[in-house]
């Protein structure tokens, strides 16, 4: 059988939460250490279940879930998101602006594919949720990391962010609350990022 070789597009893609970290954890388990696996964000094994109301809504709507929804997502869910943005005082968000997906992973890949041409840059926090860097590379873009230093509570360094914007910058990734650091950004900091983006 002819060997199958991976695409050269993967040469700059790292996704440690499914590779080296898992391998190191397996080795530690083999050595008798107890490992709590939080690498992929699956909290259900640790008792973080969906609220009862959500579970009941899922059960009640199961008969309606045997087919595809609208390509932008379920209407009622999109409408709930729109109402939430209105409650926050965010003007101008319509149903046509809201797209839902099967978790963040699908939407991250869709967003980078839709946004980036070959060679375009996307500012990504460091440390980052690794799918952003991987998806940016796979989309033909270049991830440019801005600093979020531990000695500053993992907050984004706005001066560093501003300095890294160039002619090929297409966007700034903001993960709030941050994954993997858990940092929660203030409204003032977020407004500062918006000013840089403008």
Task: Give the residues covered by each predicted segment.
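A short helix-loop-beta submotif of the ANL/AMP-binding
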Residues: 138-144
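Aromatic/hydrophobic pocket-lining residues that form π-stacking "cages" and hydrophobic walls in ligand
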Residues: 21, 25, 132, 193
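Short acidic capping loops at alpha-helix termini that bridge into adjacent secondary structure
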Residues: 92-98, 118-121, 168
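N-terminal small-domain helix-loop-helix segment of the aminotransferase-like
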Residues: 11-103, 110
